[in-house]
Amino acid sequence: MKEAEVLDLLAEHGALLKGHFLLSSGKHSDTYVEKARLFEHPDVVLGFATEIASWYDAVQAVVSPAVGAIPLGFAVAEQTSARFLYAERESGNLVFRRGFRLSPGERTLIVEDVITTGGSAAEVYDLVRASGAEAVGVAAVVDRSTGPVRVPFRALVRVEFAVYDPGHCPLCAKGVPLEAPGSRHVSSH
């Protein structure tokens, strides 16, 4: 799947929103990737999952952070014949709940939807490693990172959108209302 195809799907399904957004990282942006608009379409998710699955060999488990990446992670697990787990926030940290456990040495792929700072992906990566499992990679649909990401990853498409620290956000300075569409609540500044 070529980057242009992914960008076309983002545009076609109304997944690129313009405005003033609070990202899950706590930063602000004038553009938000509303991946849920893509995930309404199983054929789109399956296409992404098939491509991501082709990048990795012998995956035994797929782990995604809840909530947004769950549909994609599940589809990648199906494509790799692996089991699927997800990590949830508890007291601010991503943890396994609901009896989810990884086995020592289990070849585990971390699947994210959008990577901005890589914080959630890094948390899941650390969780996988702490369990004794082998983290074989991190994959995402969209890479919108603007700086170094602590864990190596691959994405279907790389996009560049403006990202601002809350204290230096020109949209805040103009009084543009801030929207918080993401799945993780971060207090606004």
How should these model regions be labeled?
Residues I52-A58, V76, S145-R150:
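Alpha-helix C-terminal capping segments
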Residues V67, L72-L109, T117-A122:
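Short, glycine/charge-rich flexible loops or terminal/linker lids adjacent to PRPP-binding catalytic cores
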Residues Q60, E106, V136:
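Conserved acidic residues
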Residues E3-L9, Y125-H189:
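PRPP-dependent phosphoribosyltransferase catalytic core
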